[in-house]
A protein has these predicted regions:
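Interdomain/boundary linker segments immediately adjacent to catalytic/signaling cores
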Residues: 1-41, 138-142
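Domain-level recognition of nuclease-like catalytic cores that cleave nucleotide substrates
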Residues: 4-7, 19, 104-142
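Active-site metal-binding core of divalent-cation-utilizing nuclease and nuclease-like domains
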Residues: 38-69
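Active-site-adjacent loop/helix micro-motif of nuclease/hydrolase catalytic cores
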Residues: 56-58, 81-91
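Conserved catalytic cores of phosphodiester-cleaving nucleases, focusing on short active-site segments
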Residues: 63-65, 69-80, 93
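Short Gly/Pro-enriched loop/turn and capping motifs at secondary-structure junctions
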Residues: 80-82, 116-117
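Metal-dependent nuclease catalytic cores in nucleic-acid-processing enzymes
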Residues: 90-106
Length: 142
């Protein structure tokens, strides 16, 4: 695998107007990011919507939380809980970020508003920092 690089939104992606549901999802994502930024520790970096290029592919994790210590947390935000998120977080984002943050462990988390089966790990977004290295968790937050 080639070394991943950080970049801007690819020019070849369409600029179609988001659907009503997509707009709701974007607003919820911004709400989560704002909450994390306003309530978090100043020594913790929150990277929102960063594009990553590698192996002729491109991906964009919703949030990357980089605390001073402990694992870096890769976060996927959804309006409604999805069942296949862990695989995407580990196999797509995890592989690229493991190369960018060599020597740091990763953890993975899905934050969602609406529950559709399963049990939430927590109800508070900052509990993502309690995840152990390579652990996956889910947080329902409204």
């Amino acid at each position: 695998m080639s070394s991943p690089t950080l970049g801007h939104r690819p020019t070849y992606l369409s600029n179609n107007k988001p659907t009503r549901i997509q707009r709701k999802g974007i607003l919820y994502e911004k709400k989560v990011v704002k909450h994390l930024a306003e309530t978090g520790d100043l020594s913790t970096f929150i990277i929102h919507g960063q594009w990553i290029y590698w192996d002729k592919a491109v991906c964009q994790p919703d949030i990357i939380v980089v605390p001073q210590q402990g694992p870096i947390v890769v976060v996927e935000i959804k309006l409604t809980r999805k069942r296949n998120v862990e695989k995407k977080l580990r196999e797509v984002y995890g592989e690229a970020l493991q190369r960018i943050f060599a020597g740091r462990a990763l953890s993975f988390c899905q934050v969602y508003k609406n529950l559709d089966g399963g049990e939430p790990f927590s109800l508070e977004p900052w509990d993502i920092l309690a995840l152990k290295p390579f652990e996956y968790g889910e947080i329902q937050w409204r």
